[in-house]
Swiss-Prot record:
Annotated function: Bidirectionally degrades single-stranded DNA into large acid-insoluble oligonucleotides, which are then degraded further into small acid-soluble oligonucleotides.
Name of the protein described by the UniProt record: Exodeoxyribonuclease 7 large subunit
Family label: Belongs to the XseA family.
One Pfam family here: tRNA_anti_2
Keywords: Cytoplasm, Exonuclease, Hydrolase, Nuclease
Length: 398
């Protein structure tokens, strides 16, 4: 850019337009502060849809505007309150100077550790880490979702370990595992797996070891809440055994390493087959023992039933004999009763009026058909009826 100095008519003091003086300052800034490091605390963080990140760096006395252009890869994730050292250069925009950030590192771990402890306590009080809300892993998942970097040793180790233990379908959702976009990409991956019509049975979130800065994205509060809200069980495998992040507490299970995560998720096929064979042998032996016991029991029951059968047959024969005797006695008794009744009937027949009439007797009745048994009941001119064996006649007493 060419700068032309305009002379004032009043004196020799140079005169600039706003654009010119801004250009001079821009050039001065770029030439003087083309590569600097500025230490301060991030505040006023803003992420518009453009993908650029706007924030301010402040210390106890001053504030400077800063911007990180979309596409700049940083190891540290932006977070209000972080104390960082930003590498970049100064630039002038709209008559204001700002720091263009090209790299960023953590300034110290003391404040970070305090922030992490505070977040952990907050989520713990909410019950986010409670064992009661953790989901059990499926016994033998046939589909495993893996959220990790598509390159590097981690994904290779996981796939290799899956093949060794129990070959299963592995669906990889590639993400960045460090830097400013890491936590957002992991959140998107977890939500994406949960939205599948045929989702994986378990999810492994993994990355290899790294510095405190490298692992910082996995201390994100929104990520921890997303992990806890997942309907699919999640195993966290971040860093090495001594590395702990917030999602390790929010996950349903924590593995010390990515390969250890596979070992928690999948049983070893050879051991599983051996265990099944052992259980089969035990079951077979137990079944054979039960069969023999039942055979012995059936034989005993057969013997008992045979004895009972013979006893029942004997009792049946005795019962039949008693039945025949009872039938005979009943017949004899009935015959005697019949004879007795016949004799009674014969006796009664002698007292029947017809029988009496048949031997020459007569029955006398008055005009009211009342039987007369004494002459004293009769008077002269009384009309009577005389019944004989072969008929009746009327008569008058004279």
């Amino acid at each position: 850019m060419q700068v032309t100095l305009l002379r004032s008519f009043s004196n020799d003091i140079p005169e600039f337009t706003v654009t010119e003086i801004t250009g001079v300052l821009q050039r001065f800034m770029q030439e003087t502060f083309y590569s600097i490091k500025v230490r301060g605390e991030i505040s006023g963080l803003s992420r518009p849809n453009s993908g650029h990140v706007y924030f301010t760096l402040k210390d106890s006395n001053s504030v400077i505007n800063a911007v990180c252009w979309n596409g700049t890869r940083l190891k540290v994730q932006f977070c209000d309150g972080l104390e960082v050292v930003c590498t970049g250069y100064l630039s002038v925009y709209q008559s204001k100077y700002q720091l263009i950030v090209t790299d960023m590192t953590l300034a110290g771990y003391g404040k970070l550790a305090a922030m992490l402890a505070e977040l952990k306590k907050k989520l713990e009080l909410e019950g986010l880490f409670s064992p009661a809300r953790k989901k059990k892993l499926p016994f033998l998942p046939t589909k495993i979702g893996v959220i990790t970097s598509p390159t590097g040793a981690v994904i290779s180790d996981i796939i290799s370990r899956v093949k060794q233990r129990f070959p299963s379908n592995v669906v990889v959702w590639p993400v960045q595992v460090q830097g400013d976009r890491a936590s957002a990409m992991v959140i998107e991956a977890i939500k994406g797996f949960n939205s599948f019509a045929d989702p994986p049975h378990v999810i492994i979130v993994a990355r290899g070891g790294g510095s405190f800065e490298d692992l910082w994205p996995f201390n994100d509060e929104e990520l921890a809440r997303t992990v806890a809200a997942s309907k699919i069980p999640i195993v966290s495998a971040i860093g090495h055994e001594t590395d702990f992040t917030i999602i390790d507490y929010a996950a349903d299970l924590r593995a010390s390493t990515p390969t250890a995560a596979v070992e928690l998720v999948l049983p070893e096929k050879s051991k599983l087959v051996a265990s099944i064979n052992e259980k089969f042998v035990r079951t077979k032996i137990s079944f054979e023992r039960i069969v023999k016991m039942q055979e012995y029991r059936l034989l005993r029951l057969h013997g008992i039933l045979t004895e009972k059968k013979n006893s029942l047959l004997q009792k049946s024969r005795v019962a039949l004999e008693y039945q025949q005797k009872i039938r005979y006695l009943l017949q004899v008794s009935l015959l005697r009763k019949r004879q007795y009744l016949e004799s009674l009937m014969q006796r009664l027949s002698y007292y029947d009026s017809k029988h009496i009439l048949s031997v020459g007797y007569a029955i006398v009745r008055d005009e009211h058909e009342k039987q007369i048994s004494s002459v004293e009941a009769l008077s002269t001119n009384d009309t009577i009826t005389i019944e004989l064996k072969d008929g009746k006649r009327r008569a008058i007493i004279i």
